[in-house]
Amino acid sequence: MARFIILFLLLAPVYSRLCLRNHPDTTWIGDSRSDQSRVNQQSLDLVTNFKGILQAKNGNGLMKQMSGRFPSDWYQPTTKYRILYIGTNDCTEGPNDVIIPTSMTLDNVARDLYLGACRGDVRVTPTFVGAAELGLIGRTDALTEFSVKVLTFNNPTIVVVGLNGMSGIYKVCIAASSGNVGGVNLVNGCGYFSAPLRFDNFKGQIYVSDTFEVRGTKNKCVILRSSSNAPLCTHIKRNIELDEYVDTPNTGGVYPSDGFDSLHGSASIRTFLTEALTCPGVDWDRIDAASCEYDSCPKLVKEFDQTGLGNTDTQIMRELEAQKEMIGKLGRNITDVNNRVDAIPPQLSNIFISMGVAGFGIALFLAGWKACVWIAAFMYKSRGRNPPANLSVA
């Protein structure tokens, strides 16, 4: 039996396959080249027979849109399962954008925005901004319902952005001649914040974006990333908390630089996605947003990184080595079990022998005791005496 199992494992097909959820309750969110929320006909052809909802709502990328304006209805799908495509337009922010004191890191911004948009319910709301010129005690101008505009302050001003208890992320950019945050002098640039921010002695211009708020992370989602290296989307790729993702292949050319609407121009990606959306035999009632199948055994996409695996031959060799290692462990386990089974008869024999010796000894003791009783009773009778009751012979 063990040999049959090993032979079966050796002959079993070794392959890997990515399956994206192709189901009416799945929303595909793409990366378009502009703020226009659209998926053109070529893109529809790309995902042939896609049964879900096609929605290109992250126009220039989530982080990039914080420098413009989110569409008022940005990303409000009602489906439970989602596929979020991250293209090159999502990766254009650079480290020079994060220089305002107390700003979040790009890694943390990417994690909260993309992981939140993938799994959570998103709401875009205006960011509160309040301002009070120094010397005007008791006066505060609350600039409510204000977002994605630039204000100019010609006199030293206290500027407060955000409210206590707020949730979400907003972007601020400044061009100031004076001002500080917590005593640290300002440097012109931008930053991302998830808590209220106060500028003291501020003179110059300030830009504040909408607040991007994520509520809950209850949805199942896979993040599909471009494998293009121009530009590098390092602040997304190196974040380990974006754990359900897969890179598009770069065989036959890299992902086009102008975004989701040009995906139809890359044959390798068109083939990749078409096959990923038409995986046969996948029970989507049991498998979540995406799966990777090794020998018909579903695994999460986070265990599968096409770019990291290298070419197909290398992957097959790795899979074969893994199978051989598993077979070796199986063989060692079978040998160990056989050794234990072979060891059982001697152990049982020793037990039976010990029990036999003990039983024979007890029998001899009882026989000797009975003999002594008979001899004592006989001696009493030979002398004409009646033996004691405890020496009576039955």
Curated annotation (Swiss-Prot):
Q: What is its EC number?
A: 3.1.1.53
Q: Tell me which parts of the chain lie in the Extracellular compartment.
A: 17-347
| TM spans (from-to) | 348-368
Q: Which UniProt keywords apply?
A: Fusion of virus membrane with host endosomal membrane, Fusion of virus membrane with host membrane, Glycoprotein, Host membrane, Host-virus interaction, Hydrolase, Membrane, Signal, Transmembrane, Transmembrane helix, Viral attachment to host cell, Viral penetration into host cytoplasm, Virion, Virus entry into host cell
InterPro entries named in the record:
Hemagglutn-estrase_ISAV-type
Q: Name one GO cellular component term.
A: virion membrane
Q: Which residues form the active site?
A: S32, D261, H264
Reaction(s) this enzyme catalyzes, per UniProt: N-acetyl-9-O-acetylneuraminate + H2O = N-acetylneuraminate + acetate + H(+); N-acetyl-4-O-acetylneuraminate + H2O = N-acetylneuraminate + acetate + H(+)
- Give its localization: Host membrane; Virion membrane
Instruction: Classify the protein's membrane topology as the record does.
Output: Single-pass type I membrane protein
The UniProt entry's GO biological process terms, in alphabetical order, are:
fusion of virus membrane with host endosome membrane; symbiont entry into host cell; virion attachment to host cell
- What are the glycosylated positions? N333
Q: What class of enzyme is it?
A: hydrolase
Task: Map out region (Highly polymorphic region) in residue numbers.
Answer: 335-358
Q: Where is this motif: Cell attachment site?
A: 119-121
Q: What is its main location?
A: host cell
Write one Pfam family the protein is assigned to.
Answer: ISAV_HA
Instruction: Explain the purpose of this protein.
Output: Performs attachment to host receptor thereby inducing virus particle entry into target cell. Binds specifically to 5-N-acetyl-4-O-acetyl neuraminic acid on host cells, which plays a major role in cell tropism of the virus. ALso mediates de-O-acetylation of N-acetyl-4-O-acetylneuraminic acid. This receptor-destroying activity is important for virus release as it probably helps preventing self-aggregation and ensures the efficient spread of the progeny virus from cell to cell. The highly polymorphic region (HPR) modulates the virulence in host.
Q: Tell me the protein's name.
A: Hemagglutinin-esterase
* Lineage of origin: Viruses, Riboviria, Orthornavirae, Negarnaviricota, Polyploviricotina
